[in-house]
């Protein structure tokens, strides 16, 4: 399920592939859809001293529930376990808004200043760039997209999160990607848990997206 990139390519895993012939066909179609989403929406151009990577997550909850969490630029702690507090400067939520995030103990940082680059409710795209903080993730930029899909005949959601970031002095590209991917993987796992809990509390029909 984790994708690792050393210089600009992609390796994306599928954690919802089924077994048997029908499962293989479905998995192939899902992989093709993921590749198209990445080509269209997740194009990064990492420099010589940067790394880029992408992760995917299949969530058993309808896209509107998942997107309601992902789009919460002012409340990332709704699903991100390492965020303890978030304040948006000025209070208004719009492109260019900046948030001050406090990070829980356990990560090599306590604060992060982040700017909203894109929030598209039609295409379900969120893009954020780190512009300050006491971390080492310089020029970090991420894109998160969510896409409706069917999982076991029920409304599900494919989430893709990609990023590009400078490689800190003293670290390799693989080390940098491994660290960032570990954090994103925790976030996506939590996103799935929260979304699926909300889906149980607010059941939808099989055709609702």
From Swiss-Prot:
GO terms for cellular component: cytoplasm; cytosol; nucleus. Gene3D superfamilies: 3.30.530.20. It comes from Oryza sativa subsp. japonica. Belongs to the PYR/PYL/RCAR abscisic acid intracellular receptor family. InterPro entries: Plant_def-hormone_signal (IPR050279), Polyketide_cyclase/dehydratase (IPR019587), START-like_dom_sf (IPR023393). This is Abscisic acid receptor PYL5. Pfam families: Polyketide_cyc2 (PF10604). A motif (Gate loop) lies at residues 105-109.
């Amino acid at each position: 399920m984790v994708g690792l990139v050393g210089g600009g390519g992609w390796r994306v895993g599928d954690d919802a592939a089924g077994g048997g012939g029908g499962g293989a066909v479905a998995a192939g179609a899902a992989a093709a859809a993921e590749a198209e989403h990445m080509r269209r929406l997740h194009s990064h151009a990492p420099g010589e001293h940067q790394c880029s990577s992408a992760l995917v997550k299949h969530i058993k909850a309808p896209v509107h529930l998942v997107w309601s969490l992902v789009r919460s630029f002012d409340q990332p702690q709704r699903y991100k376990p390492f965020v303890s507090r978030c304040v948006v400067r000025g209070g208004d939520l719009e492109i260019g808004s900046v948030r001050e995030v406090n990070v829980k103990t356990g990560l090599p940082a306590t604060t992060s200043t982040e700017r909203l680059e894109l929030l598209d409710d039609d295409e379900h795209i969120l893009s954020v760039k780190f512009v300050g903080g006491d971390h080492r993730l310089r020029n970090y930029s991420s894109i998160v997209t969510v896409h409706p899909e069917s999982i076991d005949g029920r409304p599900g959601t494919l989430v893709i999160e990609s990023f590009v970031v400078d490689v800190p002095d003293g670290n390799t590209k693989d080390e940098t990607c491994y660290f960032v991917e570990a954090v994103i993987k925790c976030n996506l796992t939590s996103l799935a848990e929260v979304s699926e809990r909300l889906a149980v509390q607010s059941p939808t029909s099989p055709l609702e997206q």
